[in-house]
Swiss-Prot record:
GO terms for molecular function: rRNA binding; structural constituent of ribosome. This is Large ribosomal subunit protein uL3. It comes from Mycolicibacterium gilvum (strain PYR-GCK). The keyword Ribosomal protein applies. It holds the Pfam family Ribosomal_L3. Belongs to the universal ribosomal protein uL3 family.
Length: 218
């Protein structure tokens, strides 16, 4: 079965009740509407993919090259463009057509999805917050080293700092994917997905919701 995907906006979290009157924490995602602006096929492009556009934007804010792409597809400019890769044995031309509109209804209640977004930026962070280091002693002679990382390498051996050594630095603002989340409810009337659990990113951030690659749909 071909993987489905849609661009959307994270609106925030809330809680609902299931059929057993148990509280279920859900994230509300405004899914679509998306419009197909380009189709890539294995024969022509060497891989199979579909390009989706999402979000309102004033046409005067779109540069000429991108405006030309939308004009070729015969659709109004959108704020976001994303290309979703399909399996090589899946014919994008048979599954989609340029100008086709995708809504939240491409998913069903109980489906499992992978959600990709940009995590919240935390700014410059130390090793205890960024990597979960224990830190050093609070007493017994410890002098102003309580939150320091400690040694990052020997003097003579190895005589250098290994690549990838965990240190302080900018934390967050990374592309993160949370896998195997269950779609609790599809609200087709409002174009909203209620996804069980938390998803990456801030409220109002762009997310990509795709069929779970490891588990598949229910």
């Amino acid at each position: 079965m071909a993987r489905k995907g849609i661009l959307g906006t994270k609106l925030g979290m809330t809680q609902v009740f299931d059929e057993n009157n148990k509280v279920v924490p859900v994230t509300v995602v405004k899914a679509g509407p998306n419009v197909v602006t380009r189709i890539r096929t294995t024969e022509r492009d060497g891989y199979s993919a579909v390009q989706l556009a999402y979000g309102e934007i004033s046409p005067r804010k779109v540069n000429k090259p991108v405006t030309g792409q939308f004009a070729a597809a015969g659709v109004n400019p959108r704020r976001h463009l994303a290309e979703l890769r399909l399996a090589d044995n899946e014919d994008a031309g048979a599954l989609y057509e340029v100008g086709q509109e995708l809504t939240a209804e491409i998913f069903a209640d109980g489906a499992y999805v992978d959600v990709t977004g940009t995590s919240k930026g935390k700014g410059f962070a130390g090793t205890m917050k960024r990597h979960g280091f224990k830190g050093q002693g609070a007493s017994h002679g410890a002098q102003a080293v309580h939150r320091r990382p400690g040694s990052i390498g020997g003097c003579a051996t190895p005589g250098r700092v290994f690549k990838g050594t965990r240190m302080s630095g900018r934390m967050g603002s990374d592309r993160v994917t949370t896998q195997n989340l269950k779609v609790h409810k599809v609200d087709a009337e409002n174009g909203v997905l209620l996804i069980k659990g938390a998803i990456p990113g801030r409220n109002g951030g762009l997310v990509v919701v795709r069929s779970a690659i490891k588990r598949g749909e229910k």
